[in-house]
Amino acid sequence: MTKSNADLSAHTPMMQQYWKLKREHPDQLMFYRMGDFYELFYDDAKKAAALLDITLTARGQSAGTAIPMAGIPFHSAEGYLARLVKLGESVVICEQIGDPATSKGPVERQVVRIITPGTVSDEALLDERRDNLLAAVVGDEKLFGLSVLDIASGRFSVQELKGWETLLAELERLSPAELLIPDDWPQGLPLEKRRGVRRRAPWDFDRDSAFKSLCQQFSTQDLKGFGCENLTLAIGAAGCLLAYAKETQRTALPHLRSLRHERLDDTVILDGASRRNLELDVNLAGGRENTLQSVMDRCQTAMGSRLLTRWLNRPLRNREILEARQDSITCLLEHYRFEQLQPQLKDIGDLERILARIGLRNARPRDLARLRDALAALPQLQAGMQDLVAPHLLGLAKSIGTYPELADLLARAIIDNPPAVIRDGGVLKTGYDAELDELQSLSENAGQYLMDLETREKARTGLANLKVGYNRVHGYFIELPSKQAESAPADYIRRQTLKGAERFITPELKEFEDKALSAKSRALAREKLLYDELLEMLIGHLAPLQESAAALAELDVLSNLAERALNLDLNRPRFVEQPCLRIEQGRHPVVEQVLETPFVANDLALDDATRMLVITGPNMGGKSTYMRQTALIVLLAQIGSFVPAAACELSLVDRIFTRIGSSDDLAGGRSTFMVEMSETANILHNASDRSLVLMDEVGRGTSTFDGLSLAWAAAEQLARLRAFTLFATHYFELTVLPESEPVVANVHLSATEHNERIVFLHHVLPGPASQSYGLAVAQLAGVPGEVIQRARDHLSRLETTSLPHEAPRMAPGQPAPPMQSDLFASLPHPVLEELGRINPDDVTPRQALELLYSLKSRI
């Protein structure tokens, strides 16, 4: 805030009004309505000019200094708001609520809405296929309460999480646009690296206040019905969210009707690294192309796409729910029923967000037109669902229902193609309201009335030169030439004298004038009133309509998964109780879509006897693809989808871990190796015998000894944890693990050389790889020929003089004997080299003693 507001009395009346409002919102940009523009002043103007690339100018003076100013037309504000919200800014909308014609001094203004990244609901400001979440967290290092609100749909949830690691992983999954934290938390916390973190007063998270406000919001006496009455921290976070939402929206929130208690134990847990490595809905470059979501999403509605993304990011461990989804997909595939439903679903639109905007009372005419069309489409959709026999689909059909009365009302009320906003009218149909029709008729038919009046008056008076007209100053009038003015009837009242003419008005014309001049403004006011009444009536039906929207979104996702199963050759997986993961002819669902050649499918078999596969083979041979496809097949199975495999049998997993790829964390001061070890530590601490673990090239980034030792010990630990593990490595020494760990087996990706060039076969075969083909891969990558040849010479010498590939067998816990890396076995020690150069006959006793001490220090 600048010092310009220090003494309000020094400012002009208009700027005094501005500063009184601005003081309430010092950290937010204020859009201050002035006529047809939103103006920004002082620091806000400078900031907005830089962010939006708009002109910074100055407006007169106030308090003795020029006022920095920038403005945008109010009718194009949405585009600018979208850019600011995307940049993480919050904007205060300050509107004129007084009538300029009757105001003495500045027109009265007030803040009508605050737009923040986590509370936007306007269609133009949202990504239609992504959730836009507001989150709040409170607690200490041991236990956190987290609440999440999607104000654009009405979903509201709470959960409690143990430890920073779990909290940060959950925030990575949710990716909230805005995160509220207590102001008394220490500065520089890891989560503050996120965009959109806002600090709130500690008392905003008070549990007792939150409990009261939540009960009031849901019209309940307690929170037992939501299963969260004992979640003290989470309730505090939810109370903070509710207060913040009300503060920004400046209206009631009737579309927030319940609170969902989410439990980590119900889901497959993926940490942030695993989520990124698997590229579920964001690729490693930060885009959306070539992700699992991009391949699996052919949903007909935006709300269906958002639900599918939530499923992909939150796989389930509830076998009953998963098999109900599988049964639904099977049913939709029979007789290609999904093909009939999908075009009908397309007519539904984004019902979820339309209903939220109705609840927030900022729904636009086209929202109501889309709701009208959606409700009109429901009877035909229900007819298409009559043949569906899957119990879950029958339940969805019941929840969807039909709304003939609402559909009829909206069909009578809203014109076919309404304008974008209600401001200028023209939204409601003729015949919907008699008073509105009369006012609109007066406004629209004034010209015809005046022509008819002129004809009648000429006939009544016999004055052929009589004219009926209008001007803005004197309104409607009857004009007669001065010579005929004396012949005017008695009911003509003189209104104006002109050179050569007199103007009159009659009681009939005066009555019409009173109606006509106010008809347009009265028609607009009447239409706005009727529109608001229509919104209030729809708000009374929000609960069943929101239930219908949720069921329609799920039907869309299931129909989409049926379509994907047919067109991508996906098959139904089978869940079993006995721990196992068996995949026949599995494929990577994303890679096979971008390959120009057929994808090479592979089998995988893990069970109680074989818990780990050590995977060897050349770079580019397909090890990472094989590992990732396994994780994606499991993940798809545990959202209830069919999977890219000829057959799949699996037990439910509790976590999916991945240690794949290399990346540093420069901002966090962590090297590539440190990041790798942190991810490895997380896996070793948290994996269970129900987890799926993917480990790729553990130990690279440090010395050969250190890397091999760490990889070996990590593999042994995972074998003892009995987690289902795919362990890819270039350390061939690890291929002896099956001899000491019975639950470990070797497999390799096949390749061959032809004319000194490598050919990747991509088949997974039993046993370890025979060689790494590193030089062939380097040649394929374009390494210069002379470098390749020199490398062959070095390799030949090393292979001739190195120790054979074998490693001692150790029981768990047994200390490791000294081991020498075969890679450096042929290189003599520098001390030995120096000793070889010394002639003992040329050294004095003193020199020999000094040399001995020197050599000893170098060992």
UniProtKB/Swiss-Prot annotation:
One GO-annotated biological process of the protein: mismatch repair
GO MF entries: ATP binding; ATP-dependent DNA damage sensor activity; damaged DNA binding; mismatched DNA binding
GO cellular component, one term: cytosol
Protein keywords: ATP-binding, DNA damage, DNA repair, DNA-binding, Nucleotide-binding
Superkingdom field: Bacteria
UniProt KW DNA damage keyword: yes
InterPro entries the UniProt entry points to: DNA_mismatch_repair_MutS, DNA_mismatch_repair_MutS-lik_N, DNA_mismatch_repair_MutS/MSH, DNA_mismatch_repair_MutS_C, DNA_mismatch_repair_MutS_clamp, DNA_mismatch_repair_MutS_core, DNA_mismatch_repair_MutS_N, DNA_mismatch_repair_MutS_sf
Gene3D superfamilies reported in the protein's UniProt record: 1.10.1420.10, 6.10.140.430, DNA repair protein MutS, domain I, MutS, connector domain, P-loop containing nucleotide triphosphate hydrolases
DNA-binding recorded as keyword: yes
Pfam entry (one): MutS_I
Binding site for ATP: G617, P618, N619, M620, G621, G622, K623, S624
The protein's role, per its UniProt record: This protein is involved in the repair of mismatches in DNA. It is possible that it carries out the mismatch recognition step. This protein has a weak ATPase activity.
Protein family (similarity comment): Belongs to the DNA mismatch repair MutS family.
The name this protein goes by in its record: DNA mismatch repair protein MutS
Species this protein is from: Stutzerimonas stutzeri (strain A1501) (Pseudomonas stutzeri)
